[in-house]
Amino acid sequence: MNNIRKTHPLMKIVNSSFIDLPAPSNISSWWNFGSLLGICLIAQILTGLFLAMHYTSDTMTAFSSVTHICRDVNYGWLIRYLHANGASMFFICLFLHVGRGLYYGSYMYLETWNIGVLLLFAVMATAFMGYVLPWGQMSFWGATVITNLLSAIPYIGTNLVEWIWGGFSVDKATLTRFFAFHFILPFIVAALAGVHLLFLHETGSNNPSGLNSDTDKIPFHPYYTIKDILGALIMITALSSLVLFSPDLLGDPDNYIPANPLNTPPHIKPEWYFLFAYAILRSIPNKLGGVLALVLSIAILAIIPLLHTAKQRSMMFRPLSQCLFWILVADLFTLTWIGGQPVEHPFVVIGQLASVIYFMLILLIMPTTSMIENRLLKW
């Protein structure tokens, strides 16, 4: 068995990635989220596959097919809620994974980081299109509002929106193509995740200290396999509790009303994991400006390595940067809260302030603070 593990062409890849992989001896539980994201992706693909067996992507029957899944299909309710809440777990793990990368300077692995940013965009696109499929009120109006943002692009905007819609409004053609894209994108995400791992294993994992760990490596199995299993059990427990006790906690009640193009809901808002970006979009009165801010709120991650002015990689020994990092986290929570509130005083002003603070922290305050820390350490 020992020989086949190291000689068989396929087993050799698995062995060098998950068994004999040299890993730093001091990586904490913050390094668990990569494997949790892999588990989430597999769970989403499997539950999605079973949902697709019963779902119909037609405006007349989409809503009732989801009802049929919940009422008539064996454990259909469980599959549907695992899929919906699995997306929430996916984004919780994603945000924590990105946060870990920012805190410990993992973004210095440029290829791994940039593919991670691409993955984030791909997962967000997948989740957005998936939210449209049940064809409830929030599905329809969310799709209308978000796709309409593309009309802000000069010259080609209107044509682009009508091309995406497949007509002059969100209708049957839109739903069908969104279903097709929602089905294919997770497999593209899986392929990108493979490339993400490939580049990670070229350099090896970072660690909390941010120092080179070549002198102190341990095999991935059994040390980190058992650690990942513990993380997976905790996540599965959390997801099961959510699905079995309050499956609609994170959803919008409006999505239990079939889509009606003649009746606009009082508050159109996306799922909770997009609210921070939605708040940034709404905080700018100009349409094109808002769209640019929305894209930049995520795309800004790609230039984080260029903004790294510190002489140390990790924030572990940089207390000022740590304070700013947690202010950034608090700011993102504030934006998430504002994104779910109506557009009225004082929420508008709070959203604008939080948006300015978000970009100021990343582009100006954190790099400047890192330089101050360098001076304090006489580096």
Swiss-Prot record:
Cofactor binding note from Swiss-Prot or TrEMBL: Binds 2 heme b groups non-covalently.
Subcellular localization(s) per the UniProt record: Mitochondrion inner membrane
A single MF term (Gene Ontology): ubiquinol-cytochrome-c reductase activity
Residues at which heme b b566 binds: H97, H196
One GO CC term, this protein: respiratory chain complex III
Pfam families associated with the record: Cytochrom_B_C, Cytochrome_B
Binding sites annotated in the UniProt record for heme b b562: H83, H182
Resulting phenotype, H345Y: In strain: Isolate HS1296, Isolate HS1297 and Isolate HSO960926-1
Note: Heme 1 (or BL or b562) is low-potential and absorbs at about 562 nm, and heme 2 (or BH or b566) is high-potential and absorbs at about 566 nm.
Name of the protein this chain belongs to: Cytochrome b
Native organism: Crocidura dsinezumi (Dsinezumi shrew)
Gene responsible for this protein: MT-CYB
